[in-house]
Amino acid sequence: MAEIKPFKAVRPKRDKVSLVAARSYDSYTTEQREARLRDNPFSFLHVVNPGYKYSQVIEGEKRYNLVRNRYQEFKEDGVFMQEQTPCYYIYKIVNHEGVAFTGIIAAASTQDYEKDIIRKHEDTLEYKEEIFVKYLKTVGFNAEPVLLTYPNNDTLAGIISSVMQTRAEYEFTTTHRDTHYLWPLSEALVVSEISEIFKKMPTLYIADGHHRSSSSCLLAQELAQENKNHTSKEAYNYFMSFLIPESDLKIFEFNRLIKDLNGLSKEEFLIQLDFSFRIENRAQHFYKPSKKHHFSMYLDGDFYSLYLRKDTYEINNALQALDTQILYKLIFEPILGIKDVRNDTRIAYTDGKKDMAFVKTAVDTKEFAIGFGMLPVTTQEMKKIADEGLKMPPKSTFIEPKLRSGITIYEF
């Protein structure tokens, strides 16, 4: 039984939302970030980059405290207002290609995370969790929701569709030509019905935001120990999430680029590859795999198709069946000598939206020696990994929608 609940969001006033909403800090180039901070005093980037006010880079506890100060200033200056009644928020994003993502912004339970009702498919890094726990404890809010997915539900879809027939509280288009819509929903009977629908769902799945959700859970445990009157219903026992149906989730692959062939000649490398894959040289013809366990490779001016020789590789669980794991186990580790795909500087990743033409250019310019492409992970594969308690290799999925910060804020 999944528990979600409505909350009183702090959010921008209607005339400011398009100016406040910001992509994740790291998604901007230095030049883009500088331009937005210089030209837009309402950007949420001012909150998360408080040192800009003094032309200083501020880090650690000092930064966290100043983030809190900037946030309070936005509230004091009337940029933000707080909802008077707990709401669910129907949220819709239509990207520049016309693809729509529609779901519900709500507070999800850290206890559900602990009980594996909310399931994970990625490993988290302890040092990142420690940093983010300190950050959350100081600032006291979530500004970017964790992306969760749930099985398609006709009743829930009907409720959402009905709400979207009314005028949206927010409707704005970004410079990326993505259009955002938000409907606060406070009607008690409908709110209760939504909560009951989720209570009947045995599991939810994290699509994006593993570090944010794990850090929220760790913080809840810490604050519970500090609170002698802890009831498990305090706001810190929840984290902001955006829940979308599985059919709306879009998963793209990450292609791989490798700096060198680990001292092997092209011919020596291909011979070693031949033991595990059937290899076909496709010359200059772009090749994108059409089946699982088929791979595209670009090397020395030629595209190759690689087909796994099934008698050379044993598949006993969902992880072993993943194409990213097959590349690691049969090529990267034994042939190219890459044992740590997270930290080895010889490997780089490019999301599948850039396609194999991007990979070709990176190899042709001699920045990399070889590139690999594959089909994206499916939602069912992602769920199976989570259900079996396994974790995907790093950079196995590039997931949309990518969410903006500052549209709704959850305080705890």
Task: Pin down the residues of each PLM region.
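Surface-exposed, charge/polar-rich loops and edge strands
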Residues: 1-412
